[in-house]
Amino acid sequence: MATINQLVRKPRSLKAAKSNVPALEACPQKRGVCTRVYTTTPKKPNSALRKVCRVRLTNGFEVTSYIGGEGHNLQEHSVILIRGGRVKDLPGVRYHTVRGALDCSGVKDRKQSRSKYGVKKPKA
C-alpha cells in the first residue's frame, strides 16, 4: 500500500482503455481498397456463406470487413468506406462495410431499415 506522501509525489495512473477497432485510429470511418472479396463460414452453431472482404486502409492497416445486406457489387480494387462493429459469428471480422458510400452500392429493392443499407427513399 502506498503512503500518502508517495501518492502526492506520483498519483495512481488510470489503465488505458483498449480499442475494439484499432485500425480506425479514433476516426468514425476509414477509406480503403478491397484486396480480396470472398465468402466465409460462421462459427458453430450457425451455417451460412457470409460475404466479407479484405481491405487495405489509407493508414496502411489491412483488415477484414463484413458486407451486410443481400447482394453487393464489390470486387478487387473497389474503394470502400468501413466503420466499426464486429460480426459475432465470424472470428477476426471487426469492421463493417458502409453500404451506399464510395464504390459500394446500396441494397437493391430495400424498403425497410433503408438508412443502414444506403438506400434512397423510393418515389411515392
UniProtKB/Swiss-Prot annotation:
PROSITE patterns, per database record: RIBOSOMAL_S12
Coiled-coil residue windows: none
Modified sites of kind 3-methylthioaspartic acid: D89
Signal peptide range: none
GO terms under biological process: translation
CDD domains for this protein: Ribosomal_S12 (cd03368)
Alphabetical keyword list: Methylation, Ribonucleoprotein, Ribosomal protein, RNA-binding, rRNA-binding, tRNA-binding
GO molecular function annotations of the record: rRNA binding; structural constituent of ribosome; tRNA binding
Keyword rRNA-binding: yes
Any Gene Ontology CC annotation: small ribosomal subunit
Function: With S4 and S5 plays an important role in translational accuracy. Interacts with and stabilizes bases of the 16S rRNA that are involved in tRNA selection in the A site and with the mRNA backbone. Located at the interface of the 30S and 50S subunits, it traverses the body of the 30S subunit contacting proteins on the other side and probably holding the rRNA structure together. The combined cluster of proteins S8, S12 and S17 appears to hold together the shoulder and platform of the 30S subunit.
PANTHER family reported for this sequence: 30S RIBOSOMAL PROTEIN S12 FAMILY MEMBER
Family the entry assigns: Belongs to the universal ribosomal protein uS12 family.
Assembly: Part of the 30S ribosomal subunit. Contacts proteins S8 and S17. May interact with IF1 in the 30S initiation complex.
Record's protein name: Small ribosomal subunit protein uS12
Species this protein is from: Pectobacterium atrosepticum (strain SCRI 1043 / ATCC BAA-672)
